[in-house]
Amino acid sequence: MILYYEGTDISDDVDVKKCVYTDVSGGRRDLIDIEFEYSNKWFGWKPEKDDTIRIVHDGLDTGILYANTVLPEQGRYRIIATGAKSAARRAATASYEDKTLGAIMRTCAGECGMDQGLYGISAGTAYPYMIRENETCTAFLDRLLIMEGGRLKCMNGKLRGIGIEYAQGQAATQCIELEATQLQARYQRRDDMKWSGITVMSPFAKASAYDSSVDGDNQPVVTTLPALDGAQAGRWARGLLLNHNRQAEELNMSMEFNAGLTAFARIDIESDTDANGEWVVDETEHDLILLKSTARLFRCITTIR
């Protein structure tokens, strides 16, 4: 394991006792929780909030994360670092008039002192008017991205808006064989939580989206969004339905360390069970001391209309 602190390799200066890396999607921040024995060089590093930490290990590269908490605990130091700087936790209220999604992303990223990027979502998507309601930058951006059919990921110094369909459309990074008797896997399907459709309605516009794989009439109506025309209402309805229904089929797995399990990665599952098929990783946890990996995946869905 190679541990970089502020860009310097300090692997030989510390004795790491615990190192867990959590790689997530859905507006949450990647996280490293690391403990090492007391080092007499520690004070010489002059640790400060938002110092950068990066770990590379056997094919896994966490990218840059930012020190959030530094705690001395029983002769050890514990560091918690996250994928976004501390400024990203500051809540604020703001309004945006005649702005594109790309412009809003740049403004919020600048507020956090980070970079930004959009993948599978148009930066030119226009918002005649949008309000940020006492939200952190990351919470606000994730709310917008959910409506646009994506999610926010804070990774390697960058606020990334990633489209769900974009992630689903990528080539599988690996194929995992799963047997019915495998104790380290749990498959869950909850058809009762799916919506057959959703309607976005405002004083100015109304539009609906539907999931062709769902029977019944479970169709909520959302009246709290500032849709100003039918195209915007329809786009938001589709994004909300996609993000909700994809959570109905979930697969949780534990295995030996697998560096290829990363959030938003496309995975093929080969199995004689109902879990067979195409999935997208939602969250992974890698224990770099015990060399174990766990992952939660959501089924790819292509039935939203």
Predicted feature descriptions by range:
Residues 69-83, 91, 287-302:
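Short, solvent-exposed secondary-structure boundary/capping segments
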Residues 36-39, 82-86, 162-168, 259, ...:
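Secondary-structure transition/turn motif
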Residues 76, 83-84, 118-192:
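Short beta-strand-centered interaction patches in the first periplasmic/extracellular domains
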Residues 31-35, 54, 64, 78-80, ...:
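Beta-strand secondary-structure signal
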Residues 2, 154-156, 163-246, 250-293, ...:
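Acidic, small/polar-enriched beta strand-loop surface segments
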